[in-house]
Amino acid sequence: MESPDSSSGSAPPRVLRRQQQQPGSAPELPPGFRFHPTDEELVVHYLKKKAASVPLPVTIIAEVDLYKFDPWELPEKANFGEQEWYFFSPRDRKYPNGARPNRAATSGYWKATGTDKPIMASGSTREKVGVKKALVFYRGKPPKGVKTNWIMHEYRLTDTSSSAAAVATTRQPPPPITGGSRGAVSLRLDDWVLCRIYKKTNKAGAGQRSMECEDSVEDAVAAYAPSSQQHATAAAGMAGSDGAGGVAAAHGGDYSSLLHHDSHEDTFLVNGLLTAEDAAGLSTGASSLSQLAAAARAAATPCDATKQLLAPSPTPFNWFEAFLPRAKEFPSGLSRSSRDIGDMSLSSTVDRSLSEAGAVAIDTGDAANGANTMPAFINPLGVQGATYQQHQAIMGASLPSESAAAAAACNFQHPFQLSRVNWDS
């Protein structure tokens, strides 16, 4: 009695798969395997063997005459491939006695672009084994064809190209086709060339442009960062200084640098006008002039830095020139009652501008409220603490002896009464 598995044993699945696979059918690759050969592998291991009629290891490249179809019809005729497809295709001559290939297709033509790229062997000899040419498909007829996204890479052997060049040089026609009438000439240029077809997409380029735009927006936002941290750092620096004396020492006695103008943010930072306690309260982030002015008005007593502003600076700075437009020249015949302009006066030289008058800090001596204790040059910025008496002190009215001496040191001229000018408007 024969055992059931003695003679009727089944072949392994791999053997059955080889038996079921027919010549010309698509190969069955295991999951994860892709057919992605290099240019050298395509020429050496596939095109050379195909031209020499040597059997290929697998039937993975179909034999199709590419110029009888449009490129969008070729994927369904390929044996293998998802995004790119490989074919063995013959090439015909464009003219019977020429060496130029015929690139015409069904509804368009293939146009060569760029220069031919030589394909070198990877051995020590580094010999040239083939040539690679890139072509683009155009709809319509030349030269008014419409460019498409279909690309072809054509691989040919160097021996074939050299023989074709020899034929073109000697102008010897190819052998006639046997059985043809009147000795018809064969238009076959190459028996086989290997072609790779794929469609170019712009998704990667669009995504890259989108990422570049996002990066540029982020860079712009980072470049225009809020300046609150910078202002907080400046306020903390005021708080860390040792009162007004520390500020004066830091500036080397030149109080003209106590007013800092930030041209990028259009804000003004006044350093040294507040006490250490006031500056410590502002260290949390005072970033605008209105907050600084409110804190100055809320001060209980005048700070020492305000009084020290009466001392002359080594390099006098014209505050009116920095904050006010240049004054117009007033004719000497103008007259108006003093109630319109009070007791204010200007330099006796009428043609001098207001920028030559200098600056004097105001200290009305009202220590109870401290609201009037502010430098005169802050008033053009809109600080409400400047009063009518401050205007008098600015323009050279009656001042204490110390203030008069400071005014003389700041190049003040003799008072001159102006009329028909309303300085309060």
From Swiss-Prot:
DNA-binding region: 129-206
A GO cellular component entry from the record: nucleus
Positions in coiled-coil regions: none
Gene Ontology terms: biological process: regulation of DNA-templated transcription; system development
Residues covered by region (Disordered): 1-34
PROSITE patterns assigned to the protein according to its UniProt record, in alphabetical order: NAC
Chain ranges of the NAC domain: 29-200
Compositionally biased region (Polar residues): 1-10
Family matches, as SUPFAM superfamilies: NAC domain
One GO molecular-function entry: DNA binding
Localization annotation: Nucleus
Low complexity compositional bias, start-end: 12-23
Keyword tags: DNA-binding, Nucleus, Transcription, Transcription regulation
Function: Transcription factor of the NAC family associated with male fertility.
UniProt comment concerning the protein's domains: The NAC domain includes a DNA-binding domain and a dimerization domain.
PANTHER family per record: NAC DOMAIN-CONTAINING PROTEIN 10, NAC TRANSCRIPTION FACTOR 56
Protein name: NAC transcription factor ONAC010
Species annotation: Oryza sativa subsp. indica
Lineage: Eukaryota, Viridiplantae, Streptophyta, Embryophyta, Tracheophyta
